């Protein structure tokens, strides 16, 4: 039962993304939310990594399952915005593909803009870079939480063994 709860946890970044985009339109609150959301999402994703580490799922599978939606979102984005033309693009799939990493925009935009020739210009290149960087950031954060818990657990086991 506990492992089934993990499925719900990996869908929550979509909710973060939706709320970030929704609240961004509210004066005052939107700017604050937009600024804080990357840190909230990264702390949450670190915690999700910890939860997957505690699960009964084998380590490799836990790392894959925990990050599968993040990677699939990036692939969906690539398909919708790079491979398909504007006339064939699904607005629903196009928006969903960005929700997973959109809360990280205040961080990833700083790197994506570096790829532009003109200052303060955002093109498809910088947006794709933002999505790739966001995905990498989430995978690393998840992995950090996962490893943190494994190390903590192994130290506790060592203390218990030494204490007996």
Role assignments for model-derived ranges:
Residues 115-140:
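Individual transmembrane alpha-helix segments
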Residues 38-66:
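Canonical alpha-helical transmembrane segments
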Residues 1-48:
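Transmembrane alpha-helical insertion/packing segments
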Residues 24-35, 58, 85-90, 122-126:
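Membrane-helix interface and helix-disruption motif detector
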Residues 18-29, 51-54, 77-87:
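Juxtamembrane "helix-exit" motif on the non-cytosolic side of transmembrane helices
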Residues 40-47, 135-147:
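Hydrophobic cores of alpha-helical transmembrane segments in multi-pass inner/ER membrane proteins
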Residues 152-164:
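Short, highly charged, low-complexity non-transmembrane loops/tails of multi-pass membrane proteins
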Residues 84-112:
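Juxtamembrane non-transmembrane "cap" segments at the membrane-aqueous interface
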């Amino acid at each position: 039962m506990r492992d089934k709860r993990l499925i719900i946890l990996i869908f929550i970044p979509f909710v973060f993304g939706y709320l970030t985009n929704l609240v961004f339109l509210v004066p005052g609150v939107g700017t604050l939310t937009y600024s804080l959301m990357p840190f909230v999402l990264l702390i949450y994703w670190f915690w999700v990594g910890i939860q997957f580490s505690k699960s009964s799922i084998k380590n490799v599978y836990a790392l894959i399952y925990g990050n599968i939606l993040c990677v699939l979102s990036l692939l969906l984005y690539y398909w919708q915005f790079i491979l398909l033309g504007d006339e064939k693009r699904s607005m629903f799939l196009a928006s969903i593909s960005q929700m997973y990493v959109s809360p990280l925009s205040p961080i990833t935009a700083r790197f994506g803009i570096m790829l532009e020739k003109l200052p303060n210009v955002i093109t498809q290149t910088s947006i794709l870079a933002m999505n790739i960087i966001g995905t990498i950031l989430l995978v690393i954060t998840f992995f950090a939480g996962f490893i943190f818990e494994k190390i903590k657990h192994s130290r506790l086991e060592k203390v218990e063994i030494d204490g007996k």
